[in-house]
């Protein structure tokens, strides 16, 4: 709707063939029509119909991220809308519960080497205490294309990358890709394309490492979690964890190739703290070395957060309803 309002033409059609030349994609054909344009954005999802024609290859993250399948299902909305989304560890993966308008969106992301989709459904129903209707069964290979931009084609979204939605990274990476592309499309050349690909690869390595960080766990109670314990971490994450064990992550640790990474020092510090990965004595020494003025400011911020008066706020569900009426 928004695109049409901005003057975009929408064609409800199905691609049957893609023709290439030395400049990239020459034209696209459907059963009834030929489409010929100067530049193409590949939004064909896992099919990668355009970027695949130009030789992009898939770099799988499956050596580090074990999830391969998911079942997705809705559940009724609760009386009050929670302020958070739930990610719960399960026997062979994890389950998400996301409150949306009128219902809850749910899914069990699992490693199919250990359970089937049917077994995943049984485990979910046992946890919830009632039956569910599986809306979709999804299979995927976590990873990213080596070159999301080749000649006159740029892959964005699922055609460029996908990892399990543990941190809802797909929308964020797509938005950042679009911003980067918008800045580099004017009079672009091979150097512009190469720089774009370097930045997007850095974004995806940041996502991969942050997801892998969540699995640095002492859990060993099922065959899947035993496998997780022996699964190698990405080399970049291994090196960073050695550094972060005795000092907090800082902004400079995340800006080597691009400023568009999704996850920064604050995200990493929260997860590492929850997983008890810090040497707290070393961190305390670092904290005590801060100037007195900074320590006083931190103390005031903490007091303000602790003494926050919840009675002066309105329920989250009511707030969302008011916002919807404003749009």
Language model features with spans:
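Long, low-complexity C-terminal extensions of enzymes
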Residues: 183, 187-327
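Glycine-centered secondary-structure boundary/capping sites
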Residues: 55-56, 129, 157, 307
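Predominantly flavin-linked oxidoreductase catalytic cores and closely associated redox partners
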Residues: 2-128
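FAD/FMN-dependent oxidoreductases across multiple families
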Residues: 101, 110-220
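Tryptophan-centered motif/residue detector
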Residues: 40, 58, 94, 149, ...
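Residue-level signal for threonine
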Residues: 21, 140, 264
């Amino acid at each position: 709707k928004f695109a049409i309002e901005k003057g975009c033409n929408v064609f409800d059609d199905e691609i049957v063939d893609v023709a290439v030349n030395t400049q990239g994609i020459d034209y696209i054909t459907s059963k009834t029509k030929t489409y010929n344009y100067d530049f193409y954005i590949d939004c064909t999802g896992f099919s990668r119909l355009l970027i695949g024609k130009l030789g992009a290859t898939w770099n799988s993250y499956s050596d580090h991220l074990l999830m391969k399948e998911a079942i997705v299902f809705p559940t009724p909305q609760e009386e009050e809308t929670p302020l958070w989304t739930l990610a719960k560890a399960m026997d062979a993966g994890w389950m998400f519960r996301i409150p949306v308008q009128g219902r809850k969106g749910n899914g069990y992301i699992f490693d199919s080497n250990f359970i089937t989709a049917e077994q995943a459904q049984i485990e979910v129903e046992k946890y919830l205490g009632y039956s569910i209707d599986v809306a979709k069964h999804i299979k995927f290979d976590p990873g990213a294309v080596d070159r999301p931009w080749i000649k006159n084609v740029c892959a964005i979204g699922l055609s460029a990358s996908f990892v399990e939605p543990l941190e809802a990274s797909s929308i964020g990476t797509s938005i950042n890709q679009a911003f980067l592309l918008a800045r580099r499309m004017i009079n672009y050349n091979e150097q512009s394309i190469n720089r774009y690909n370097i930045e997007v690869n850095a974004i995806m390595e940041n996502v991969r490492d942050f997801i892998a960080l969540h699995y640095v766990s002492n859990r060993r109670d099922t065959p899947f979690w035993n496998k997780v314990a022996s699964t190698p971490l990405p080399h970049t994450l291994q090196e960073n964890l050695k550094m972060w064990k005795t000092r907090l992550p800082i902004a400079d640790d995340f800006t080597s190739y691009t400023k568009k990474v999704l996850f920064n020092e604050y995200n990493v510090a929260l997860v590492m703290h929850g997983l008890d990965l810090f040497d707290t004595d070393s961190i305390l020494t670092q904290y005590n070395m801060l100037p007195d003025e900074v320590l006083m400011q931190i103390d005031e911020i903490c007091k303000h957060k602790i003494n926050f008066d919840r009675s002066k706020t309105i329920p989250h569900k009511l707030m969302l309803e008011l916002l919807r009426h404003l749009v």
